[in-house]
Design a protein with these regions (language model features):
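Solvent-exposed loop/turn and edge beta-strand elements of beta-rich ligand-binding domains
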Residues: 2-508
């Protein structure tokens, strides 16, 4: 035991902080007023999304407004003998922490005879009629979360040493425990460095810079040795994979890895493996058009990374990154992304982030009174922004008329700087613009096709989500009023001759 304790010293130090909220459950030095032969335990599995520590007292804390976690399975093990053996060389806190860090070293976690209970719709799991004493000594129990529903992380193993008592010294016979259930989350937090509300779907424009955050908990035993091992660590894999299955986003940067108020990205740089969809090797590993992977323990110095993470064992970590909406995003197509956190090759925690979508608009420029397509009409796009008229500058367009898939849309008050949009000769929609935010705009015709005149230079419209494939706005031009034949024909000469003859007849 001495060797194992020495090996996990750094991890144990961090674990003691986590175990502190269990200290009230360790035996107090008060006089027992009445003998207790059996005890009941009620576990309250509730969602937690922060570093909040719920102080376990053994009493029902009456917590309300918390989301219960249904479907978690807990096993209970009697670790009395192991606990008292450790007490020969360690104090109670250290002994409890050692068992919590390496429970599989003291019990058979796959023991088919172990009692197992699944949390119900209220997040409760009850263990009834457990012996208060084992072999004449106060019993010590370990609670192990065997099955964890998605997208939650497994709670730390909890060690409870009986008796647990009321303030008056009498034994509690129904002990309430609150295992921490950390939720893996994925959120879009900013668009163009402006905070956005949490919701399931965000409207974006091409060129927008999106900031995402993936949050999860560093395992409380990240630095512990594997069960029954003197030199192999429990965790040899720690990966975060984030990806999109549809095109529309370009990875920009990993901006921060924050835990306990500290940004540890710089300390991890070049110690972990970091790959993005901008790297050539990405497509050989992941068949996704967008994403990144952080392999914390797969780099050149996994021990240094493990030691760093051990300092923050049990804390929530935030991985922040940015992506740019690109021209490949199809209007009205909802694009979501997924985060996966894995601590071993056989299991992963998966969470879906919010979806994003961009908009677009279709126009058909035609001859009035017919469906004849008119090419080479010229337009600019404008909008009103807080009573200021702005004009669209479409970046990255290929110069071909009719279809505009910009890499970015910026807005200027200088009309001369606006991008000139020309219609093609397409027989349906001959002017399309992609990557717009939903909203109100005005298309301004600045030049009609040759031989036609502008009826009304402005067309007000609203880009509405869900209408890209179904709505086309028609804009008509009328032919120029041609009273005289074109120069070079005989019509004008004949007209003048007839006029001269008629005039002569009048004067004769």
């Amino acid at each position: 035991m001495q060797v194992t304790f020495k090996k996990i010293g750094h991890s144990l130090l961090a674990a003691l902080m986590l175990m502190s909220f269990l200290l009230p459950l360790l035996s107090a030095g008060k006089t027992v007023h009445a003998a207790t032969t059996t005890v009941d335990f009620t576990l309250h599995k509730i969602e937690q999304t922060s570093d909040e520590q719920i102080q376990n007292t053994g009493h029902d804390l009456g917590l309300t407004g918390r989301k219960p976690v249904q479907g978690a399975q807990f096993k209970i093990f009697n670790v009395t003998d192991a606990f008292y053996q450790l007490l020969e060389n360690h104090d109670k806190t250290t002994a409890a922490s050692m068992i919590s860090q390496n429970l599989g070293q003291y019990v058979n976690l796959q023991d088919p005879g172990a009692a197992i209970v699944t949390t119900d719709a209220d997040g409760l799991a009850a263990f009834k009629g457990l012996a208060a004493k084992t072999n004449g000594r106060h019993s010590v129990y370990a609670f192990h979360e065997a099955v964890t529903p998605q997208p939650y992380q497994k709670a730390a193993d909890m060690i409870v040493s009986l008796p647990v008592r009321h303030d008056d010294g009498t034994d509690l016979t129904n002990i309430h425990l609150y295992p921490k259930d950390s939720l893996v989350t994925k959120n879009l937090t900013e668009i163009n460095e402006q905070a956005v509300a949490t919701k399931d779907l965000h409207d974006v424009a091409v060129g927008d810079v999106l900031t995402y955050q993936v949050q999860f908990q560093i395992p409380h035993d990240i630095g512990a040795l594997a069960d029954h091992s003197q030199d192999t660590f429990k965790y040899n894999q720690f990966k975060v994979l984030d990806y999109m299955t549809k095109e529309g986003l370009t990875f920009k940067a990993l901006t921060a890895i924050t835990v306990d108020g500290q940004d540890i990205l710089k300390a991890l740089t070049r110690k972990m493996v970091f790959m993005t969809s901008n790297d050539a090797a990405w497509q050989h590993t992941h068949n996704y058009p967008f994403g990144f992977e952080l392999d914390f323990l797969g780099g050149v110095d996994p021990d240094a990374v493990r030691n760093l993470l051990t300092q923050y064992a049990g804390k929530r970590v935030t991985v922040a990154y940015t992506g740019i909406v690109n021209e490949k995003m199809v209007p009205d197509q909802k694009v979501g992304n997924t985060a996966e956190v894995s601590f071993d090759p056989d299991s992963k925690i998966t969470v879906n982030g919010p979806e994003i979508q961009t908009g677009g608009i279709r126009f058909f420029k035609h001859e009035a009174g017919s469906s004849k397509s008119l090419a080479n009409a010229t337009f600019i796009l404008q909008r009103m922004n807080a009573n200021v008229r702005e004009y669209a500058v479409l970046e990255g367009v290929n110069g071909m008329p009719g279809t505009y898939q910009p890499t970015k849309i910026t807005w200027t008050t200088n009309q001369d700087a606006a991008t000139k949009l020309k219609t093609s000769g397409a027989e349906t929609a001959n002017l399309t613009i992609q990557g717009l935010l939903p909203g109100r705009y005005t298309l301004v015709e600045t030049a009609a096709p040759e031989g036609y005149e502008i009826l009304d230079p402005t067309t007000d419209f609203e880009a509405i989500a869900g209408t890209w494939g179904t709505k086309t706005i028609r804009i008509a031009n009328t032919p120029v009023n041609q009273l005289l034949p074109m120069t070079g024909g005989i019509g004008l000469f004949a007209f003048l001759m007839i006029g001269a003859i008629l005039m002569g007849a009048v004067t004769s």
